[in-house]
């Protein structure tokens, strides 16, 4: 069972649903990245384009032991890639970390973080149609 989302997401946070049924949150901008992080639990998975600017994506899990299928990891990575500096490439390198290892930096712009422990880094295809396919009412 997945944790329910709070009613009324902030305007700057987009909701997607992976084909495996996981809720995926993506910030629309720096403030949206901050808002998405605040909605996440320590055991949720955080994704971001490697070595450059982009949106944060959160994969919500019911608990820390809940496995996330490869397809969901790739789809969430694709959503991160579509709103990153790698959006025009064929593939993008995405980093993955548990939220407990993602820390906001003080005295910096909203959405700037430090990652203490990355558990994966992988290339995913950049597919802009993915955004439409994973919308909740698509």
Q: Whereabouts are the PLM-identified features?
A:
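Duplex nucleic acid-engaging cores and interfaces of nucleic-acid transaction enzymes
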Residues: 1-138
């Amino acid at each position: 069972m997945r944790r329910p989302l709070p009613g009324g997401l902030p305007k700057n946070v987009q909701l997607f649903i992976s084909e495996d049924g996981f809720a995926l949150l993506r910030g629309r901008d720096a403030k949206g990245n901050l808002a998405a992080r605040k909605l996440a639990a320590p055991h949720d998975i955080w994704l971001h384009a490697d070595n450059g600017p982009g949106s944060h994506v959160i994969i919500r899990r019911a608990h820390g032991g809940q496995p996330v299928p490869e397809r969901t990891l790739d789809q969430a990575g694709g959503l991160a890639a579509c709103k990153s500096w790698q959006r025009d490439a064929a593939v993008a390198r995405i980093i993955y970390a548990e939220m407990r290892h993602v820390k906001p930096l003080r005295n910096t712009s909203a959405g700037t973080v430090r990652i203490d422990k990355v558990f994966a880094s992988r290339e995913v295809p950049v597919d802009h149609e993915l955004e439409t396919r994973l919308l909740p009412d698509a």
